[in-house]
């Protein structure tokens, strides 16, 4: 089936992410987004503060609409553990406005997306 995969990874896990992409029968296409989390952590060789969103392709995918206007780099503070910036979803929607979308390991429901994940139906506890 024709589809695109947008997959988050950190630099230390890049080989595993590319291996998983291949196991799912996607071909590596590019890095879609580079997220500066605005917080530096110790890295293996340099200080680490980014995550990568990779793109894999399966089949023939048309050039995304408005792709020339969508920037690869974004700087946004980290939220709760493993949450990704909403802005990336908006950018994907801008590029592919009519295609169906699914988010795996989602933390919340998002209008217009099928969202699968353990946290989707959980209600955040109230803090007194």
List each language-model region with its residue ranges.
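Class I S-adenosyl-L-methionine
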Residues: 1-7, 11-128
